[in-house]
Amino acid sequence: MAVGNPLGLAGTVTTGIVSALNRPVTTSDAQTDPTQQTTSDPVVTNAIQTSAAINPGNSGGALVNASGQLIGINSAIASLGSSNGSSSQSGNIGIGFAIPVNEARSIASQLITSGKATHPYLGVASKDGVVADGSAKRAAAVLTNVVSGTPADKAGLQAGDAIVGVDGNSIDGSLSLVAQVRERTVGDKVTITVLRDGQRRDLEVTLIAKPATTP
């Protein structure tokens, strides 16, 4: 059930199902080209997709299960004018997104403790690509830039590497890479699997707090 104030109608409750989990969704202020991403681009990390009606005014409201337990925070809708999940003035078409409660709780805790939220930073830019993986081909996030001195650089990541996994989770493009990084916390050690020169390599990266300014 989604609770909120759609179109100014306070206390509205709508029902639906969880349509999908771990759905990387670009927020409305992300850069124009969704195939060119950096790990500091704004996204909803691995969002919950729901069929419960979500409309403008629902953002920030609760998404709860049948027992009344909070499972997410309503955040965005897909519209006919926007295929990347960003909110718009269009109405609900049965595809809404919510930030998972665990991520929302982590951010809220940081805001209460320090007055600000920190986000993990890898230090790469990537694009969607299709690369050879043995005798097959697969989708991946292909690095277009690795910023000097960042966790990615220190771990040995290079421009041209095709990232296909993070901690065993499959990466099929730039958005899924960004979402996986955003799901972590500052200080986490993550194993990044890349394809380089036709060979798989596992590199360990320690994520740092996102700098105030990034290249």
Specify the residue positions occupied by each region the protein language model found.
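Active-site loop architecture of trypsin-fold serine endopeptidases
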Residues: 3-17, 22-60, 65-108
